Amino acid sequence: MDAQLVHTASPGGLRPDFIWGVSTSSYQIEGAAGEVAADIEPWLCLYHWDLPQALGDLGGWTNRDCAQWFADYATLMAHRYGDRVKRFATFNEPSVFTLFGYGFGWHAPGISDSAMVLRAVHHVNLAHGAAVDALRAAVPGVSLGCIHNRQPCRPASSSPQDVAAAQQLDAYWNGAFPDPQQLGRYPTLLADATAPYQRPGDLARINRPVDWFGLNHYSPHYVKADPSNPMGFGFGSAPADVPRSSIGWPVQPEALRETLIAIHERYALPIYVLENGTASADAVNSDGEVDDQPRIDFLRSYTAAMFDAIRDGADVRGYFVWSLLDNFEWGSGYSQRFGITYVDYPTQRRIPKTSFHWYAQLIKAATVKPDFVEAQALQPAAQVS
């Protein structure tokens, strides 16, 4: 059934992720085969924050050996799936799991230590370079990328402290991974800080350019200085007049256009938007339907911003909405629904939301005639068979 939902809403592509440690299970092997058989192109990411506990016990990403362990895992995945998967990403949002896992302590392994963040950042970059080499050696013609959560980092106020804090977060969030991977150097604000963890030749090992830039984008960050935080900065609030989603994130579609242009100008890579969407307080109405107009409004404004960026020169090749289904979110469990398909968790019943039908129309229109997308976005959602 889920494969049919993909065909209806977004024919041609799905972005599932492997789980390190169980990726050779029959469940994931059969799943990959099933997607290909259903004429769905899988875009597979090797790492979505699920480090095996056994490796975590050995230091996880603070252990330099983790880079080679990851390369071995990439080689195994290439041999298992390379005959049916041609698009691989090494990591999903490395800035999130390193900064939030080792700096803020919000995600696993729950560490708050600025030095550990830098160590983890460097080792993840080494793992990326080693995995790119392994995948290219094992899968001829493979198309490779890394998926970055990237957004503008704006000061919460005009104070010099907040301005400096925003610049510091920008270096970690937006530059710590794509800069060494694509440009062969760390951002200026991180160059000296990462030096203690570098060995001769490391930047060359990391600098394994990929074929495309994967972008996850939701909203800009508003940043404030926070001396009590080990990182020296924290997250502030957007101005009061900025709309917010039900999860509290600012809704500012112009930030997506700004981000796409910045990526294009700095890295000159084809860009695929691999996550973009919003949480909404969805419920099944008396007619058995889910009317999620706020999500349609969000997607309309953000896809319009994306097409503005394309007209301004950004080389955007594709767009994936987050997400096909309501699912478990890292920071909020099942309390926030991002899907264009409603999932009744006790029964697992799927109910396409109003946004599902709107999005299916949008994708079909954009595929045939991109300039038609704004006109299409203004039309009410209709049922799609």
Regions found by a protein language model. Give the residues of each.
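Active-site region of glycoside hydrolase catalytic domains
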Residues: D2-V36, I40-S385
